């Protein structure tokens, strides 16, 4: 055998003495297939003498081992590396088919992805501006070339062309797409399996004999600090719902994220105890009570201001919308439910207002009862009641022109004091408890102190107007809901002057102090009455002195 594959070799030469020109041997040399089969079937005869050879290097041993032959080993190695190289070339060719150098395509001005879209977008430009003949010709040729290429390549599954015979190009393209999709799906299926293998819990590998050991292991090695989301602080996130817009398309609220500074801190919330909560609640209630008592003492002007500042909902009549409300058929069920909810809220507000007014009326009733009891108690223990004689009206005509005429008229009218006193006692027999001398009728100090207790309790002849006095009826005053509108109720409250009995007995407390009846301005009749009392006291004194024999200075009439 040749030592190297590159060396040329030929068939062995015929041995010496071989006669080719012999016709018999020539005929014998024409062997058939049958002779070839016989030759193969006959065993080889052992050669008696070997032909001479130049070198024994190329002679094969009797027991040939291919592994020991270096040439065979070289051939095996060469064929193995040739196969690897062939596989690598095929892989590179497949990658080269899938790979596109888009940068090179952009440099060359050939971009297959955007050619069709550019042509479609530029069709309007051809009509807008009159193109040149060369540009029109080049655009038409380009379009024709694209159509021809698409026909030759078979298009795709969406845009196919009629091709004679089987469209191998399209078939190959679809097969490649299916193969790539299957490969991607397999990769996606393999990824979770790898992740599950990596995420295998080491706890499963460890064997625990007791439950306590497992819990200790979990506490030491598996304790995780929980991460808190900053958006979920108390009061951080809120929902803003637009209630004013009744015709909104959607009822989706707006999410509002407040600043951290506006949110209450966790420490401030957790440090509150039950005592602090009770104290804060008590202070709140006391502040409400304090404000309520101040609001009761508002003047009429302030009341009018407050009523002007009231929202329009408070001015609505409770029966204002009854009979006017017509439900619309075009409204959605959600709008109807919203309307019903608002109606219920208004009814609740009205009930609360009524209950508040009733409670206020009950409080006034209780106050009147207490005042009545105080008045009765005062009447029982009053020692210095006003004499009923003073309540009698006196027929006093026009005042006299001078003091002389006044004295003359008094002397003519009341000739005897005893008779006058008798008539008075007949008129009022129930005035036995009256202390006459104490009030200055027959007191010797009357001349020095003419203004006595009667003057401090001056009463006019006019009848007292008790129509404004609160009689203490059980029904109570009129409330807000006894009027049709808020304007009528406010007008009634501004003009109302219902005073309790204590005001008639003790006077009305004004801003400058309590103004009682004893400080009331006296009219003309009261002034004349007081002057008459003074003069009658002087006359009585002189009569007594004359009776005792004392000389009295007489006036000159």
Curated annotation (Swiss-Prot):
Renumbered ranges of Sequence repeats: 342-343, 344-345, 346-347, 348-349, 350-351, 352-353, 354-355, 356-357, 358-359, 360-361, 362-363, 364-365, 366-367, 368-369, 370-371, 372-373, 374-375
Record InterPro entries: Red-like, RED_C, RED_N
Bias-annotated ranges (Basic residues): 294-303
Chain residue ranges for the region called 17 X 2 AA tandem repeats of R-[ED]: 342-375
Biased composition (Low complexity): 42-53
Record GO biological process: mitotic cell cycle; mitotic spindle assembly checkpoint signaling; mRNA splicing, via spliceosome; protein localization to kinetochore
Phosphoserine modification, residue list: 287, 417, 460, 536
GO cellular component, one term: cytoplasm
Cross-link Glycyl lysine isopeptide (Lys-Gly) (interchain with G-Cter in SUMO2) placement: 151, 310, 331, 386, 388, 404, 408, 496, 501, 509, 541, 543-544, 553
Highest taxon in the source lineage: Eukaryota
Residues modified to Phosphothreonine: 485
Biased composition (Basic and acidic residues): 16-25, 304-313, 332-398
Modified residues (N6-acetyllysine): 98, 137
Pfam families in alphabetical order: RED_C, RED_N
Compartments where found: Nucleus; Nucleus, Nucleoplasm; Chromosome; Cytoplasm, Cytoskeleton, Spindle pole
The entry's keywords: Acetylation, Chromosome, Cytoplasm, Cytoskeleton, Isopeptide bond, mRNA processing, mRNA splicing, Nucleus, Phosphoprotein, Repeat, Spliceosome, Ubl conjugation
UniProt region (Disordered), positions on chain: 1-90, 181-205, 294-402
GO molecular function: identical protein binding
Signal peptide: none
Family from the record: Belongs to the RED family.
Role of this protein: Involved in pre-mRNA splicing as a component of the spliceosome. Auxiliary spliceosomal protein that regulates selection of alternative splice sites in a small set of target pre-mRNA species. Required for normal mitotic cell cycle progression. Recruits MAD1L1 and MAD2L1 to kinetochores, and is required to trigger the spindle assembly checkpoint. Required for normal accumulation of SMU1.
UniProt subunit comment: Component of the spliceosome B complex. Interacts with SMU1. Interacts with MAD1L1. May interact with DHX15.
Protein name (database record): Protein Red
Gene: Ik
């Amino acid at each position: 055998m040749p030592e190297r594959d590159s060396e040329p070799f030929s068939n062995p030469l015929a041995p010496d003495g071989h006669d080719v020109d012999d016709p018999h041997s020539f005929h014998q040399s024409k062997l058939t297939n049958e002779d070839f089969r016989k030759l193969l079937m006959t065993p080889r005869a052992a050669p008696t003498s070997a032909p001479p050879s130049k070198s024994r290097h190329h002679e094969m041993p009797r027991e040939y081992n291919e592994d020991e032959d270096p040439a065979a080993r070289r051939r095996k190695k060469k064929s193995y590396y040739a196969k690897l190289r062939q596989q690598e070339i095929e892989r590179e060719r497949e990658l080269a088919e899938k790979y596109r150098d888009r940068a090179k395509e952009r440099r060359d001005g050939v971009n297959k992805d955007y050619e069709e879209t550019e042509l479609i977008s530029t069709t309007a430009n051809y009509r807008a501006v009159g193109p040149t003949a060369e540009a029109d010709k080049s655009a038409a040729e380009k379009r024709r070339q694209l159509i021809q290429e698409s026909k030759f390549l078979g298009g795709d599954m969406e845009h196919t062309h009629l091709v004679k015979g089987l469209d191998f190009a399209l078939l190959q393209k679809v097969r490649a797409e299916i193969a790539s999709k299957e490969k991607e799906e397999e990769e996606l299926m393999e990824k979770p399996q790898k992740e599950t293998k990596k995420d295998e819990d080491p706890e499963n590998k460890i064997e625990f004999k007791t439950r306590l050991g497992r819990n200790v292991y979990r506490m030491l090695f598996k304790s995780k600090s929980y991460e808190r989301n900053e958006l979920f602080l108390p009061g951080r996130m809120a929902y803003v719902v637009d209630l004013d817009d009744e015709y909104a398309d959607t009822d989706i609220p707006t999410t509002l994220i407040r600043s951290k500074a506006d949110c209450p801190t966790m420490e401030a919330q957790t440090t509150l105890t039950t005592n602090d909560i009770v104290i804060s609640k008590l202070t709140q209630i006391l502040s409400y009570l304090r404000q309520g008592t101040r609001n009761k003492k508002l003047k009429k002007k302030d009341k009018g201001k407050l009523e002007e500042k009231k929202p329009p909902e408070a001015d609505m009549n409770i029966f204002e919308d009854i009979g006017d409300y017509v439900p619309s058929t075009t409204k959605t069920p959600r709008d109807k439910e919203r309307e019903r909810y608002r109606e219920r809220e208004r009814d609740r507000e009205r009930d609360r207002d009524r209950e508040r007014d009733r409670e206020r009326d009950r409080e006034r009733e209780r106050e009147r009862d207490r005042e009545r009891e105080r008045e009765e108690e005062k009447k029982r223990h009053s020692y210095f009641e006003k004499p009923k004689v003073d309540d009698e009206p006196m027929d006093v005509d026009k005042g006299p022109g001078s003091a002389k005429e006044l004295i003359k008229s008094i002397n003519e009218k009341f000739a005897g004091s005893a008779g006058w006193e008798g008539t008075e006692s007949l008129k009022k027999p129930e005035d036995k408890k009256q202390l006459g001398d104490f009030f200055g009728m027959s007191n010797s100090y009357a001349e020095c102190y003419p203004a006595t207790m009667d003057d401090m309790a001056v009463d006019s002849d006019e009848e007292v107007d008790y129509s404004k006095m609160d009689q203490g009826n059980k029904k109570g005053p009129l409330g807000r809901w006894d009027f049709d509108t808020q304007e009528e109720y406010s007008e009634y409250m501004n003009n109302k002057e219902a005073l309790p009995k204590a005001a008639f007995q003790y006077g009305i407390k004004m801003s400058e102090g309590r103004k009682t009846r004893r400080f009331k301005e006296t009219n003309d009749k009261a002034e004349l009455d007081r002057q008459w009392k003074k003069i009658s006291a002087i006359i009585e004194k002189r009569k007594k002195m004359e009776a005792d024999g004392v000389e009295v200075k007489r006036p000159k009439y």
